Structure formats: C-alpha cells, structure tokens
A protein has these predicted regions:
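Conserved active-site-adjacent core of cysteine acyl-enzyme catalytic domains
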Residues: 1-116
Length: 116
C-alpha cells in the first residue's frame, strides 16, 4: 500500500509550490514548517518557479530533477512522490498511480484523484 503524503493547505494563492515542498519534506519525516521554508526563499510576484522549488529541496539534500511528461501513462515510471506543475498554473504532489488513476495532494483542494 502506498503511503499518502501529508495534506498541507495553502494559505495564499501563490504558495502551492511551497506547500508541495513541505508535504514532500514531511513525507520523509522533516519537522520543518511553512514559516521555515518562507524564510529560506524569496517569493516572486507570481509565486515560486520550478527552479526555486528545486533549490529549496536541494538545500535539504534532496536529489531533484525536472521532467516533461506528455503521456500520463509515463508518470508511473517516475519516482513518487513528485511535485507536478498542473495545468500550467498550479503545483500538486502526485503520490500514487494505480491502474487508470493518478492520486494527488492539491494544496488548494486536499486529496483527489483523476482517471486517465
């Protein structure tokens, strides 16, 4: 059975990426808080870039990579959990892919799944 990542609710519209990072950190038993992460990285007008999130996780000894997935069936080949840039506007954490469903933690909606 796949363990869920913690649900971290975003407090502002532009903190979805930061919340996804915190969810991954808590999944791996970190005790850091959202405030700790906010202090560690500057926020741009539109929130955080993929590069910002990678830098934040790399500082914490995470090995990060960036992938562009055009076929949703290929997600299951990637290491989970992962942070995904969803619909070109929002970050979510994908924590499980099973049969024809992808399971995500969305910082604005909580746990949801989509069929593909």
């Amino acid at each position: 059975m796949t363990r869920k990542v913690p649900n971290i609710e975003q407090m502002s519209q532009i903190e979805c990426g930061l919340c996804c990072c915190l969810s991954i950190l808590h999944f791996y038993k970190s005790k850091e808080t959202l405030l700790d992460l906010r202090r560690d990285i500057e926020k741009g007008r539109d929130g955080y870039s993929i590069g910002d999130l990678k830098q934040l996780l790399n500082k914490r000894n995470f090995d990060t990579g960036s992938y562009q997935v055009k076929d949703v069936n290929k997600i299951s080949e990637l290491p989970l959990p992962l942070i995904a840039f969803w619909d070109n506007q929002h970050y979510v954490v994908i924590y499980k892919v099973k049969k024809n469903k992808v399971y995500i933690m969305d910082p604005s909606k909580g746990y949801i799944n989509y069929e593909f």
